[in-house]
Amino acid sequence: MMNIQDNYFYIPELKYNQDELYNSYLNNDRDWARYGNQDHNSLHTKYVDTKEVEHIINQFKRPEIIDNVKFFKTMANGVVDPHSDNRNVAINIPIRTNDSQNTIFYESKGDYDNPDINLGDKKIITNAKRYNKVEETQRFVLNQPACLNTSLP
């Protein structure tokens, strides 16, 4: 089993205003991309103009390494299948969550497929992996900013 530091760490010193981010989320008119074929078990993403979150990005020692910022959502009563992508890490900043929503890490016990990204009528091939057989290794509540190891399912 992996050490907790291998999967994620909280970033409590990161300062942001949840209401401002939520308003930015509501007013963002870009299209949602869906990683997968069905709404209820897919991750939905939308790019954010980095100028809107510059005050957050500039809190990092090397803000130039941040190459994109996205909003993520899951559908009400939905789940996101175990997955990984081509990034090494992601910084997740919760805007609207509750303490019953867990982020879970897994160990792959079998094969995976590569879900398409669905953006409107377009399908985009991705290197993301959706795992078919997994074993849970860690669970935590994402109720504050955290850096996640996104190379793990």
Q: Across the structure, where does each feature detected by a protein language model lie?
A:
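Non-heme Fe(II)/2-oxoglutarate
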Residues: 1-64, 68-71, 79
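Low-complexity, compositionally biased segments
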Residues: 9, 20-22, 88, 114-117, ...
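Catalytic core of non-heme Fe(II) oxygenases with the double-stranded beta-helix
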Residues: 65-67, 72-145
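Terminal, low-complexity interaction segments
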Residues: 144-153
